């Protein structure tokens, strides 16, 4: 790896690690959770986190009808408050009606409010054009990714880039688009 490549990889990891630290700095993990054995962040990471301005996030007006379902899924699946809300905001192009209905699909063929690929929707047993069922399924899926990968940053990377890719290469090897996705979500709830 070239020195520039190593530097870019390090910056990419920081984009994931810093928001993850911010999301969990005030939480106390319970024994048996993936974070319970994690050592505290070092002083340099704490200083870096302190230097980043917290971005405020609130749901757009178009999301009002989904707010209770999102909050319920976040609570049910033990997600940090706002994580699923911000994730679905990005996935659905700010709760655009044509995305939620399935009328507009992603370039890759993802459908609905949670932008599930057809195979993922089938695996989860959900109709991706049913926004309320998809909200719950997205929360359930994110919890399973968190349980598998041990932190919300890696879970988000797996949701966006694919579980197999994160297993094979690690979240730090994710492409810039995925790293930006993770940073936008975790940075907004930090």
Predicted ranges, named:
Residues 18, 42, 82-83:
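General helical secondary-structure elements
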Residues 1-29:
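Single-pass alpha-helical membrane anchors
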């Amino acid at each position: 790896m070239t020195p520039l490549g190593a530097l870019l990889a390090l910056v990419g990891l920081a984009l994931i690690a810093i928001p993850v630290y911010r999301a969990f700095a005030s939480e106390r993990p319970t024994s048996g959770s993936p974070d319970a054995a994690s050592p505290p962040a070092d002083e340099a990471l704490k200083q870096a986190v302190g230097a980043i301005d917290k971005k405020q996030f609130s749901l757009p007006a178009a999301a009002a009808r989904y707010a209770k379902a999102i909050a319920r899924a976040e609570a049910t699946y033990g997600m940090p408050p706002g994580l699923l809300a911000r994730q679905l905001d990005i996935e659905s192009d700010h709760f655009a009606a044509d995305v939620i209905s399935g009328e507009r699909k992603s370039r890759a063929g993802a459908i609905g409010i949670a932008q599930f690929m057809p195979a993922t929707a089938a695996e989860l047993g959900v109709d991706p054009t049913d926004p309320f069922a998809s909200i719950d399924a997205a929360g359930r899926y994110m919890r399973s990714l968190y349980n598998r990968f041990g932190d919300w940053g890696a879970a988000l990377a797996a949701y966006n880039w694919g579980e197999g890719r994160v297993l094979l290469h690690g979240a730090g090897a994710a492409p810039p688009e995925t790293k930006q996705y993770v940073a936008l979500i975790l940075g907004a709830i930090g």
